[in-house]
């Protein structure tokens, strides 16, 4: 199984000729706008969203297109499990029934957090997907799950923003590998130096798209390998 992270052109996805899993961790332009092109050009069976997005204009456009293309819309919340195939399933950890109020509209605070389990030959590899969650959501996850958050690989929240990746959350996840999806020379200052330091403090190996380009993770029965478009010098 291969998982390709971050922004990819539709043409590239088609060229790879392999199955993909698409979900909108939150319906904001930097997370979901590309879904329209995906749905228009690729045969998509299901799209996974969370209920907090229902008031978004972009969400409404995506839903309209899904109905036109007969794409099944799965709205998820904490406690659900989604089986992809005999090897892979996702456990939805967030959001819960009650939406978190972060004073900023709640988009980040209520983004989908999902833990992926890939089991091949009795060996399970786990990846934590975090959307743009920030401190308030991380605190809730730590309170509910504690050490059950542990994962082999972490998709770092909010592009490495200083408002995310708190020490308590990272301690519970304790990832061997961290993936940061971030644009080169971005104006936000992502990833934050404090976030990088906290990851280094727990001996996590960091992969960044601004430094390495496209990141591909391949999980097989023997090992988990990571390839990048730009090689480390």
Indicate where each model-derived feature is located:
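Non-globular, low-confidence helical/coil segments that flank catalytic cores
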Residues: 1-233
């Amino acid at each position: 199984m291969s998982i390709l992270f971050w922004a990819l052109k539709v043409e590239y996805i088609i060229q790879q000729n392999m199955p993909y899993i698409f979900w909108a961790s939150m319906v904001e332009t930097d997370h979901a706008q590309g879904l329209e092109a995906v749905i228009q050009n690729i045969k998509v069976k299901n799209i996974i969203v969370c209920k907090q997005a229902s008031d978004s204009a972009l969400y409404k456009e995506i839903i309209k297109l899904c109905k036109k293309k007969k794409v099944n819309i799965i709205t998820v919340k904490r406690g659900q499990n989604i089986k992809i195939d005999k090897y892979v399933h996702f456990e939805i950890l967030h959001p819960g029934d009650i939406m978190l109020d972060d004073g900023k509209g709640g988009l980040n605070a209520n983004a989908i957090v999902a833990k992926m389990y890939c089991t091949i030959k009795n060996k399970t590899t786990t990846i934590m997907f975090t959307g743009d969650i920030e401190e308030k959501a991380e605190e809730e996850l730590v309170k509910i799950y504690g050490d059950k958050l542990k994962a082999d690989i972490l998709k770092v929240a909010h592009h490495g923003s200083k408002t995310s990746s708190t020490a308590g959350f990272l301690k519970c996840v304790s990832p061997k590998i961290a993936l940061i999806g971030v644009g080169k020379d971005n104006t936000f200052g992502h990833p934050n130096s404090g976030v990088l330091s906290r990851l280094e403090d727990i001996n996590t190996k960091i992969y960044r798209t601004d430094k390495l380009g496209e990141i591909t993770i391949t999980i097989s029965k023997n090992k988990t390998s990571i390839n990048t478009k730009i090689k480390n010098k």
